[in-house]
């Protein structure tokens, strides 16, 4: 089943063309790898898929609804694109609970299970400011998956992780794929793209 349709997508900033005639049909239960040089437009494309920016022309449809026409944002999406907006003096659990309160349909148990899936302890009383970069990345993954979204859009999901963390996140993504999620990843780690992707796109 098609989850995402990208139809002749263009994005220009001033005279610079960032995205040029991007087309793709992305199905549920698959992982799609996007790769290319720095500045090629991967992050811009992901921001467009999440409804964070409006394309210059073309369409993005999520479950048949056109972004910026039928709706502004995808209904069920987990995202890692930029530095997450975590509160420095909240614990990991407190951060996710605060973010979950916006949607009001994620239980404390779901939050705890998401934190445990990424190898963290929901009872850890350390505040976010004291997390290492790797722990911050793990918490960002926990945030992305805690709602069990239909769509995961992940820019550099294994960034800052050690070997154990990389393997853990790869396994989580495969589990999310099995659950039926549509997963978009962009990575400079060639192994991420090669090992995880059902289909690859050069941007």
Language-model features: where?
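Conserved ABC ATPase "signature" region
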Residues: 97, 108-124
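The feature captures the beta-strand-to-loop junction immediately N-terminal to the Walker
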Residues: 35-37
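Hydrophobic anchor residue at the start of the ABC signature
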Residues: 141
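Catalytic Walker B motif of ABC-type/P-loop ATPase nucleotide-binding domains
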Residues: 152-156
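Helix-to-loop junction immediately C-terminal to a conserved catalytic motif
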Residues: 50
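Conserved ABC transporter NBD signature motif
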Residues: 58-73
């Amino acid at each position: 089943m098609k989850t995402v349709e990208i139809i002749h997508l263009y994005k220009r900033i001033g005279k610079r063309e960032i995205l040029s005639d991007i087309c793709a049909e992305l199905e549920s239960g698959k992982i799609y790898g996007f790769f290319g040089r720095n500045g090629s437009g991967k992050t811009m494309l992901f921001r467009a898929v999440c409804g964070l920016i409006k394309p210059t022309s073309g369409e993005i449809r999520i479950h048949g609804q056109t972004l910026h026409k039928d709706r502004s944002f995808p209904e069920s999406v987990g995202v890692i694109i930029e530095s997450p907006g975590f509160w420095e003096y909240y614990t990991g659990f407190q951060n996710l609970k605060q973010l979950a309160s916006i949607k009001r349909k994620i239980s404390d148990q779901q939050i705890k299970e998401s934190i445990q899936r990424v190898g963290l302890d929901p009872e850890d009383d350390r505040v976010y400011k004291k997390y290492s970069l790797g722990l911050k990345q793990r918490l960002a993954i926990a945030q992305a998956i805690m709602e069990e979204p239909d769509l995961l859009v992940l820019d550099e999901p294994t960034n800052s992780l050690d070997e154990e963390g990389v393997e853990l996140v790869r396994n989580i993504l495969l589990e999310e794929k099995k659950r039926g999620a549509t997963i978009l990843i962009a990575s400079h780690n060639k192994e991420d793209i090669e090992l995880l992707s059902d289909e690859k796109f050069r941007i």
